[in-house]
Amino acid sequence: MFQTLMKSVFGSSNDRYVKSIGKIVDQINALEDQIKALSDEALKAQTQKFRDQLADGKTLDDILPEAFATVREASIRVLGMRHFDVQLVGGVVLHRGEIAEMKTGEGKTLVATLATYLNAIEGKGVHVVTVNDYLARRDAEWMGQLYTWLGLSVGVIVPNIPEHARRDAYNADITYGTNNEFGFDYLRDNMKHDRASMVQRPFNFGIVDEVDSILIDEARTPLIISGPTEDKTDLYIAVDEVVKRVDPEWYEADEKTKNISWTEDGNEAVEVLLKEAGLLETDNLYDVENTQVVHHLDQALKANIMFKKDTDYIVKDDKVVIIDEFTGRMMDGRRWSNGLHQAVEAKEGVKIEPENQTMASITFQNYFRMYPKLSGMTGTAATEASEFWDIYKMNVVEIPTNVPVQRIDEEDEFYKNTLDKFAAIAKAIAEKSAIGQPVLVGTVSIEKSELLSQFLDKEGVKHAVLNARFHESEAHIVAQAGRLGAVTIATNMAGRGTDIQLGGNVEFRIEDELKDMEDGPEREAAIERIKAEVKAEREKVLEAGGLFVLGTERHESRRIDNQLRGRSGRQGDPGLSRFYLCLEDDLLRIFGPDTLFAKMMNSNLEDGEAIGSKWLSKAIETAQKKVEARNYDIRKQVVEYDDVMNDQRKVIYEQRAEIMDSEAVDDVVVDMRHDTINALVTTACPPGSYPEQWDIEGLKERVEEVLGLAPPFDQWMEEEQIEPEIFEERIRELADKAMEEKIAATDPAMWKRVEKGILLDRLDHHWKEHLATLDALRQVVFLRAYAQKQPINEYKQEAFGLFERLLETLREDVTSILIKSEFRIAPPVEQELPDLPDFLTGHIDPLTGLDDSNDGDGSAQRAELFGSLAGSPRAAASPGGASGVTDNPYAGQDISRNAPCPCGSGSKYKHCHGAAI
């Protein structure tokens, strides 16, 4: 009450902040006549003028008023659109690195041009991030007209474009693309062995469209580039067959957390089934020998019970495709980890792709926090304002609408069960459609959208269904959802980014209806006809009450509900919104208070009868807040754990960059060799120990294993006052001499490439293994809570130790390969290297898709760079040490890398003749 009174007297802090920006808007408006008087050439010349001013010491804030006035006038001349004052406010907010919350239809795309142009003048690059490829292409083409007119370059990043085009797009002043494309390019760049092949340049300024969707909804799922491991198809299928025989009483499922566990009776029963299937190594299910089977059993149970087809995923083209729970869109290229995706594939009987090992990973939180300045736009951010600040240090500023919102948001209607609810929904839709009022229906899953479609078919109501199955036509369906009597069913908020205009969208109608008509008088006449029809239809829709938004159930997040409501009432248009709920809705069933069901049952509701109640609405809001808090905790935990990895990732990526930028890395290699020798001696002869305590035999073995040397330790031990430091110095001299002889017998230019190539390769290899270890640690560290320990603190401590071990192993590995291997110059490679290195073709991501053709160790690329490598710890050298890719008699044959080598050595193929493949 007191806060409400204070706001009414003094206004909210948001109101005061927006009002303060009004002074800048006044400066921009004061320049309008002056800028309007400029010729086209003079207006275009403003960009160079601003660049000169920046070079003379002015700041972006200094030139902001005139730059914004320039963009507004250029927009009028090029696009036929003038920025409103509230849009200028939004532009200032974006430039300051904040989030502009603007209602649907307020022109966020146009707002972005202000901050984008201003920051692009510096020439350091501006990234405009969208939620899908369609919007990236559309906005780059649409707003690109304005930027290029003003002398700026524009690029767009979409899947499957060549590397050179991708690099050119990043070098443009302004680059459009999706969050996935930007993130995966960052990871791929940091796996390359040559700086020239990288596509991104240093981060500068990013503007994230639909910022809540990208930075909040998708923040629970990290971006992962991975390579396939060994094929376990038979095991997945066998375990799935066992799980399909499981009795529901054998397990306990928690729908809130999507966790599932076996009961005591279930453990015993499933153990019998596994024995019958011949899947157990020992009699006891939980013996260590059965760890892998138990893991796949748990994943198969989760896949069969907790993951629902057409809700969590769909099957398309014989593949399991994940459905984004917030947008209803397909997440092409994304796969569940730890064997879960393979378990779902086995459940559905589709081709089982190999399980993958993480090679590079980053969360969206840590990716976007690398931008020195980041801003965002959305229609709904206020409910997550605290999270935006806690994670990204970004304020949310609510921008006033240009025209007051006329939409009426009605009370929710409650029904006893789903059938009653859907019958009422179908009836309401039929009534509204009959009077010409367009209806947009929001559902939470494909299954529900298709169930409602069946109800509407029975009512004889013509309608369009928009879900992950039909996403290709998404923009066109949404664009026409405001036509007279149109009924559109959309799963969650599919279609964000496309305005629903009452009466229909002129541009889309022209595109759909006149695509085959050539330019000329006939086409011009047809365009005028369509414009007139849309205008007349708009008037009829306005008379019918505008767009009616109908929600079939409440989402877990209030923000998603607000997004659905926000599709109606754009730019002062009339509109109506209403939600239909029942006790069988997931939100109420899983998270609703226990008393809700009793009160509903005692309300004497007849079948098909609805009830409206403030108490029920309050219960819904409480349940949503509970889920939002839980989801925030999950996202916060994700970033806490990734922060640990992120610190290590920065070190590794910075080290890679230094190596790539260095002409030679001989100093690094020498330091690694000396550090390795120090570690060998220190391990065998600990400081403060006596000679009789030294492990001389162990030191002999390790020096020969790592360095290929056989120093006379027995003679040295007979010397008086022998010290570990003397061992270290003498071993170092022997190792340095061996390396000097090797280098002297090798082409200097080749040796530089060898050192750099091996250093990068082994760094990548051990980083990949380190990521796998951290993943495994993450899976089990939560168990430390039972010992009254903080899992995150335990994770930090162990991760640090593992990272130190990574660096130690890297030093030893590089030293061993260089000192023990023999090299020869390979014949020159005539063909041009591919844009993407060979080892990237096995990655699971939107650019490259799935490919199980190699194990991702980069050997093919190394062979091209510096010839074959023999005698390393990873390869069995043939006599004379000249083993290599050209000496493999089995090259080209389809041999699994984990199969025994055909030569009969007893080693796996990948450790023998297949080592350089």
Curated annotation (Swiss-Prot):
Keywords: ATP-binding, Cell inner membrane, Cell membrane, Cytoplasm, Membrane, Metal-binding, Nucleotide-binding, Protein transport, Translocase, Translocation, Transport, Zinc. It catalyses: ATP + H2O + cellular proteinSide 1 = ADP + phosphate + cellular proteinSide 2. ATP binds at Q87, G105, E106, G107, K108, T109, D499. Its cofactor is Zn(2+). May bind 1 zinc ion per subunit. Gene3D superfamilies: 3.10.450.50, Helical scaffold and wing domains of SecA (1.10.3060.10), P-loop containing nucleotide triphosphate hydrolases (3.40.50.300), SecA, preprotein cross-linking domain (3.90.1440.10). Zn(2+) binds at C901, C903, C912, H913. Belongs to the SecA family. NCBIfam families: PRK12904.1 (NF009538), secA (TIGR00963). Monomer and homodimer. Part of the essential Sec protein translocation apparatus which comprises SecA, SecYEG and auxiliary proteins SecDF-YajC and YidC. This is Protein translocase subunit SecA. The gene is secA.
